[in-house]
Regions:
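Conserved PLP cofactor-binding pocket of PLP-dependent enzymes
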Residues: 289-313
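Short Gly/Pro-enriched turn/cap motifs at secondary-structure boundaries
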Residues: 32, 41, 206-211, 216-218, ...
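Conserved Rossmann-fold dehydrogenase catalytic segment
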Residues: 110, 138-147, 169-185, 204-211, ...
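Aromatic-enriched alpha-helical interface/lid elements that frame and gate functional surfaces
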Residues: 214-291, 295
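Oxidoreductase and adenylate-handling cofactor-binding alpha/beta cores
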Residues: 154-174, 187-199, 241-250
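Flexible, small-/acidic-enriched active-site or ligand-binding loops
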Residues: 320-342
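N-terminal helix-loop segment corresponding to the beta1-alpha1 unit
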Residues: 1-170
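Short hydrophobic-aromatic micro-motifs
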Residues: 50-52, 124, 218, 225-230, ...
Length: 342
C-alpha cells in the first residue's frame, strides 16, 4: 500500500480495490478511527480513492478490466500465481492495455521454490538476517520497531514504477515490475551484509553503538539519555578537551585514533559512561553543539511528534475525514521548490 500512497502524494489518481464486506485487513489493525478505519490503515492509504470488488466473480474481474483503459499502472500483492488465477495477471491485462505498467509485490522470488509462500514483514526480517543484526549482543535477535521491510519494499516499488513510466514516455512500452519482500529485506542489511560476507559469519550486534566508530551511541547523563556521535579524530579531541574537559583521554595512545578507540572500546566505554553520567544533559548538549559534534536528546515519540521542530517543518498535516472530521497524516518528507506537497 505504501507504493500507491507515494504515487498518490505525487499527484496520481490511485484507486484502491478492497474486498466487499470487510475491506482491507489493515482496517482492523491499530487504534480505530470511526467504524471502518484505523491509524494503521490511514498511515498507508491517504490520497487514495477506494472501491470494493469481488475479484472471485466474473463480474468483479470485468470491473477491473473496464478500468484498464484509463489506468497507467496496476499494483498487486497476491501470492505468486494468484492474480493469474483470477484473470488479472500481467499477460492477461497486457492484452487489454499493451503499454500497462504492472507491479507485482510478493514475499519471495516468483521463479523460485518459495514463490507461493505468503510474505509477512516479521518473517522476512527473521529470514533476511535483519533481526540478527538488531539489538544488543547479550540479548536475542530483535525485530525493528516498525515494518521496515514492508515500507522499504513500497518505496523501492514506487521508484521502479516511476522509472517504468519515464521509460514508457520515451519508448511507448509497458513493463512488468516484480518486487519481493525478501529481496528488499536483504538489501536493507547494507554494510552489515557485506561485513558478514567478508567475515564468513555474522558480525557482532552492537545495539545503540556503532561497529567501527567510538564513541557513537546512547549515553545516560545525570538527568536523561542523549545520543553522541563522534565521527572523527578531530571531533574526539574537542569532545575530550571542550565537552568532558579530560584532555588526558585523547592524549592516551589507546584512544588517539578511531582505529585504536574501536580496538579498545571495552576500556574507553566504561570511562565515558561514568564521565557523562556526571553532567546535566542540557550542558552536554550545549557543549557538544558548540564543538560541532553531532548530538541529540533521546525523545519519546509523542514528544517528537508535538515538538517545535516537527511543527515548524510542517511534517504533520490534517486532512478532512468523513467520520473523525479531521485526522493527522504525515506530510511527504521531501520539499519540491521549497514546498511540502499537500
Amino acid at each position: 500500500p505504501l507504493c500507491g500512497q507515494v504515487l498518490a502524494d505525487f499527484g496520481a489518481d490511485v484507486i484502491k480495490v478492497e474486498h466487499p464486506g470487510r475491506g482491507d485487513d489493515t482496517r482492523d489493525w491499530g487504534m480505530r478511527i470511526g467504524k471502518t478505519e484505523t491509524t494503521y490503515y490511514n498511515s498507508m492509504n491517504r490520497n487514495k480513492r477506494s472501491i470494493t470488488v469481488d475479484l472471485q466473480t466474473p463480474e468483479g474481474v470485468k470491473i477491473i478490466h473496464s478500468l484498464l483503459p484509463q489506468c497507467d499502472v496496476v499494483i498487486q500483492n497476491f501470492k505468486t500465481g494468484g492474480a493469474e488465477k483470477l484473470g488479472l495477471g500481467y499477460e492477461q491485462l497486457k492484452a487489454i492495455k499493451p503499454d500497462l505498467i504492472y507491479c507485482s509485490v510478493s514475499g519471495y522470488d516468483s521463479s523460485g521454490p518459495e514463490a507461493k509462500r505468503p510474505g509477512y514483514d516479521l518473517v522476512i526480517q527473521a529470514e533476511a538476517g535483519l533481526m540478527a543484526i538488531n539489538g544488543e549482543a547479550s540479548q536475542p535477535p530483535l525485530k525493528f520497531g516498525v515494518a521496515a521491510v514492508d515500507m522499504m519494499t513500497g518505496m523501492y516499488a514506487a521508484q521502479a514504477v516511476l522509472a517504468a513510466l519515464f521509460r514508457r514516455e520515451r519508448t511507448g512500452k509497458g513493463r512488468h515490475i516484480e518486487m519481493a519482500l525478501y529481496d528488499c529485506g536483504l538489501m536493507i542489511t547494507g554494510y552489515y551484509g557485506l561485513d558478514a560476507l567478508l567475515l564468513g559469519h555474522d558480525p557482532q550486534r552492537y545495539g545503540n553503538a556503532h561497529p567501527s566508530i567510538v564513541p557513537y551511541g546512547m549515553y545516560d547523563a545525570a538527568d536523561g539519555p542523549l545520543i553522541i556521535g563522534v565521527g572523527n579524530n578531530a571531533q574526539f579531541d574537542k569532545f575530550c578537551r571542550q565537552v568532558v574537559q579530560r584532555p588526558d583521554i585523547v592524549e592516551d595512545p589507546r584512544f588517539a585514533t578511531n582505529v585504536e578507540r574501536a580496538k579498545n572500546r571495552l576500556v574507553l566505554g566504561p570511562m565515558l559512561k561514568e564521565l557523562i553520567a556526571g553532567f546535566p544533559r542540557e550542558l552536554l548538549l550545549e557543549r557538544l553543539s558548540a564543538a560541532g559534534i553531532p548530538c541529540g536528546k533521546v525523545a519519546g515519540l509523542h514528544e517528537a511528534l508535538t515538538s517545535e521542530r516537527t511543527r515548524r517543518g510542517g511534517l504533520l498535516q490534517e486532512m478532512p475525514h468523513p467520520v473523525a472530521g479531521t485526522t493527522h497524516v504525515f506530510a511527504p518528507p521531501y520539499r519540491l521548490d521549497g514546498q511540502r506537497l499537500p
